[in-house]
Amino acid sequence: MSRVAKKPISIPKGVEVSVQSDMLTVKGVKGVLTFPKSDNVNVVMDGDILTLSANDPSHISLAGTVRAILSNMIKGVSIGFERKLELVGVGYRASMQGKDLNLTLGFSHPLVFVPPEGITLLTPSQTEVVVQGIDKQRVGEVAAKIRSFRPPEPYKGKGLKYAAEAIIRKEAKKA
């Protein structure tokens, strides 16, 4: 069996998990998340412990994937997820206009990004953007979408980068 799927999930206080025949629902302080349940994976709830197992040896990897997704759902509705982005470059700025993100990235026009449902954007400073939400996948997708407007270039390092990202720099061409 998958090492990931073998590890049981403990449910923290304030989080409710309901297992139906075709759907897994996780309710918490921050919101509600649902995930379609596969018939090939058994989910057993014993008090505040969830255990997963595969029906067939060929579905062991699926059990590990479902366990990781379920664990992230529980963490999301209790704590939440966030991704931080930094703007590096002269004149690169970020500001909030209501719920929309206004980006000045050296183009002839400012970029306006409207966040999808369930995602909160914050700008603690003009050179920082924080993406928050309860769904880990959507937070990552939105952060990647914002970063794609001006990814960091390797010569000067200008652009939008993740806070912990290390940009591999290239040396300029010598004459």
UniProtKB/Swiss-Prot annotation:
Which residue spans adopt a coiled-coil conformation according to this UniProt entry? none
Q: Provide GO CC annotations from the record.
A: cytosolic large ribosomal subunit
Q: Name one Pfam family in it.
A: Ribosomal_L6
Could you tell me the Gene Ontology terms of the biological process aspect for this record?
A: cytoplasmic translation
Q: Which UniProt keywords apply?
A: Ribonucleoprotein, Ribosomal protein, RNA-binding, rRNA-binding
For molecular function, the Gene Ontology terms on record are: rRNA binding; structural constituent of ribosome
Q: Summarize subunit and interaction data from the UniProt record for this chain.
A: Part of the 50S ribosomal subunit.
What NCBIfam families is this protein classified in? L6_bact (TIGR03654)
Q: Which HAMAP family does its entry note?
A: Ribosomal_uL6_B
Q: What does this protein do?
A: This protein binds to the 23S rRNA, and is important in its secondary structure. It is located near the subunit interface in the base of the L7/L12 stalk, and near the tRNA binding site of the peptidyltransferase center.
UniProt similarity note = Belongs to the universal ribosomal protein uL6 family.
- Please report the name of this protein according to its UniProt entry: Large ribosomal subunit protein uL6
Source organism: Xylella fastidiosa (strain M12)
What taxonomic classification does the UniProt entry list for its organism? Bacteria, Pseudomonadati, Pseudomonadota, Gammaproteobacteria, Lysobacterales
Gene name as annotated: rplF
